[in-house]
Amino acid sequence: MIFDKDNFKEFDQELWQAIHDEEIRQQNNIELIASENVVSKAVMAAQGSVLTNKYAEGYPSHRYYGGTDCVDVVESLAIERAKTLFNAEFANVQPHSGSQANAAAYMALIEPGDTVLGMDLAAGGHLTHGASVSFSGKTYHFVSYSVDPKTEMLDYDNILKIAQETQPKLIVAGASAYSRIIDFEKFRQIADAVDAYLMVDMAHIAGLVASGHHPSPIPYAHVTTTTTHKTLRGPRGGLILTNDEAIAKKINSAVFPGLQGGPLEHVIAAKAVALKEALDPSFKIYGEDIIKNAQAMAKVFKEDDDFHLISDGTDNHLFLVDVTKVIENGKKAQNVLEEVNITLNKNSIPFERLSPFKTSGIRIGTPAITSRGMGVEESRRIAELMIKALKNHENQDILTEVRQEIKSLTDAFPLYEN
């Protein structure tokens, strides 16, 4: 039978092999991509359930299809858990991704052509915060704020100045490569000063907000968006939160029928599982460990004069390092580290001088290694091995030594037990 899972290997050997190879790759690699994590078997089980068969346009109790009693329960569980976890009045769990969550928020709050103030991509923002190649930059008139050239941290006085000069209808706070605490209260004060909406994209830090290790944007933002993966450790998807009932209605209309048709109820079920996991007291320990591991790794780079640690440290799950004193660019650093089974991504740094295809920096994140059970000791050692590989990137003997030690680490901390 085609639908017999046990027959999958025989039915589609080529696809089975690709998936199997990816599982082996994940097991044998140290994953330091800040936006990646390791979900539980329960999350995967929910996402692989019969819910993938069901179409359910609309919202719980207001569907355009019959036979939705069960998926109504599933989606309602996800909604209530999201509201509880983040202490929000309203939640929409249907966005297929963080980008679509952002698109829905824009659609609900502003009109095409309106001015929006968002974080510059090179300073740590996201494509959907106004990059010219993104729908956001094509649909709305984005102006950007950056970081202070000396501290490489947000300069709220300068952001206020830009807001007063440009009079945006919406201000977007949040980042994809910023390692410091974001003061959402100050952002709301800036938004109020120019009569703008405040939207917070907390995709990268949602898990840390949930665990209590980063201030929550919910009391200050008119709308908060996030992904459900990254530090939240759920399936790949989006989520929108607000405390404003009128805005919530606009958000719901923007998601469906504005941007999407049928929701992915199997993914929503997996979101519900991840949200329940995040409500468990153990998740607070997980959030704390993510930050401890990131700070331990960052300290190793900070103590080496051949590397520049952006903003001189980290308060969250990630940090950026300028590698150009030891290797030509971030792209080459990424490739060298991949040779020794350490996966991360090249990344632009503030006031970047190289192209985004090369970059001066790399971005390093600890959610995935923390999920595997690695701690401060392992994090320090991984950073030391990274430095060893980068400084000796033309020495195959040393790269082999590093690769072997990485294998010992990954063997000691399996991706999944049994």
UniProtKB/Swiss-Prot annotation:
It comes from Streptococcus agalactiae serotype III (strain NEM316). One of its GO terms (biological process) is glycine biosynthetic process from serine. Homodimer. One of its GO terms (molecular function) is glycine hydroxymethyltransferase activity. This is Serine hydroxymethyltransferase. It is found in: Cytoplasm. The modification N6-(pyridoxal phosphate)lysine is found at K230. Pathway: One-carbon metabolism; tetrahydrofolate interconversion; Amino-acid biosynthesis; glycine biosynthesis; glycine from L-serine: step 1/1. InterPro entries: PyrdxlP-dep_Trfase (IPR015424), PyrdxlP-dep_Trfase_major (IPR015421), PyrdxlP-dep_Trfase_small (IPR015422), Ser_HO-MeTrfase (IPR001085), Ser_HO-MeTrfase-like (IPR049943), Ser_HO-MeTrfase_PLP_BS (IPR019798), SHMT-like_dom (IPR039429). Catalyzes the reversible interconversion of serine and glycine with tetrahydrofolate (THF) serving as the one-carbon carrier. This reaction serves as the major source of one-carbon groups required for the biosynthesis of purines, thymidylate, methionine, and other important biomolecules. Also exhibits THF-independent aldolase activity toward beta-hydroxyamino acids, producing glycine and aldehydes, via a retro-aldol mechanism. The keyword Iron-sulfur does not apply. Pfam families: SHMT. It catalyses: (6R)-5,10-methylene-5,6,7,8-tetrahydrofolate + glycine + H2O = (6S)-5,6,7,8-tetrahydrofolate + L-serine. The keyword Amino-acid biosynthesis applies. PROSITE patterns: SHMT. Keywords: Amino-acid biosynthesis, Cytoplasm, One-carbon metabolism, Pyridoxal phosphate, Transferase. Its main location: cytoplasm. Belongs to the SHMT family. The record marks H229 as: Plays an important role in substrate specificity. GO terms for cellular component: cytosol. PANTHER family: SERINE HYDROXYMETHYLTRANSFERASE, SERINE HYDROXYMETHYLTRANSFERASE 1. Its cofactor is pyridoxal 5'-phosphate.
